[in-house]
Structure formats: C-alpha cells, structure tokens
Curated annotation (Swiss-Prot):
Organism listed in the record: Bordetella avium (strain 197N)
Gene, per the UniProt record: nuoB
PANTHER family named in the record: NADH DEHYDROGENASE (PTHR11995), NADH DEHYDROGENASE [UBIQUINONE] IRON-SULFUR PROTEIN 7, MITOCHONDRIAL (PTHR11995:SF14)
Cofactor(s) named in the record: [4Fe-4S] cluster
Protein purpose: NDH-1 shuttles electrons from NADH, via FMN and iron-sulfur (Fe-S) centers, to quinones in the respiratory chain. Couples the redox reaction to proton translocation (for every two electrons transferred, four hydrogen ions are translocated across the cytoplasmic membrane), and thus conserves the redox energy in a proton gradient.
This protein's name: NADH-quinone oxidoreductase subunit B
Length: 158
C-alpha cells in the first residue's frame, strides 16, 4: 500500500482507493472451476508447498462467497451456460483468471465442434495463465499479477 504520509501522532495518511484496494488484495477468495488436467495443478498450488494462504488466497466452495474465479481446463459448449450462471452468482467486484491453453483459447481441442475457443467468449477474463498444463508456480504468478491489477484499479467513482 502506498502510504502518503506518517504523522508523529501515529497516524498514516493515504487515499481511500489505495486502502480499499490493499484490503481486497489481502483477501482474495477464489472459486475453483476445474474442468480438466489444469485443475490438478490448481490443487497443487493450493497445497502446502506453495501455501496460497500467505497471500490471503483461500479457496471457497460457493460462488456467493468468492470474488475470484479460476477457470482451469477445456470448456465445452454445454458447460458454457453453467460457467456464466456461476459467474453471475458471484458478488461484485469479481475477477476471472483463465488457466491453461484450453481455457485461454481451446488448446489442443481448438478445432473440435464442441469446444469453446476461450472462456473469454463466455465471461470477461482479467488474467491469462499460459501453459499445458501451467505449473503451480505459473498460477501463483498469475494470482500475484491479479493482486497487482486490483491494486491499480479505481474503487471509488470520480
């Protein structure tokens, strides 16, 4: 958090935008939308070795409790409406991370008749994590980039 000034009385001065965004980055609660092998790497990133809890990232089972969705794997045409429905159930503000080549653009199954060529055709995506499947380190890096993006947004409308 960018601190504008520290007064001698023990007060810290900063803008409301910076404070609110700092609080949001320290408490991102993702909902997993694992569709294929990328979900295994997503579970690996949530295990003890990478410990996403240290970044304030705690996986939630319900879309109503989460503010971040991680779409991991091949998205089929039949799964598209379900993805949109789950996204619409999330409270505002909400963000989406697309994990893996299949979620980013169809991947290996790009030319199949039943595969959506990128989950950004269904929901707006904020961060893309490349790879087939991406490593747990790549997902952690993508989540840190998501935190940086949240820090730079304007929370209070001007």
């Amino acid at each position: 958090m960018a601190i504008d000034g520290i007064l001698k009385q023990g007060f810290i001065t900063t803008s409301a935008d910076k404070f609110i965004n700092w609080a949001k980055t320290g408490s991102m609660w993702p909902m997993t939308f694992g569709l294929a092998c990328c979900a295994v790497e997503m579970m690996h990133a949530g295990a003890a070795r990478y410990d996403l809890d240290q970044f304030g990232i705690i996986f939630r089972p319900s879309p109503r409790q989460s503010d971040l969705m991680i779409v991991a794997g091949t998205l089929c045409n039949k799964m598209g409406p379900a993805l949109r429905k789950v996204y619409d159930q999330m409270p505002e503000p909400r963000w989406v991370v697309s994990m893996g080549s299949c979620a980013n653009g169809g991947g290996y199954y790009h030319y199949s008749y039943s595969v959506v060529r990128g989950c950004d055709r269904i929901v707006p995506v904020d961060v893309y994590v490349p790879g087939c499947p991406p490593t747990a380190e790549a997902l952690v890096y993508g989540l840190l980039q998501m935190q940086n993006k949240i820090r730079l947004t304007n929370t209070i409308a001007r």
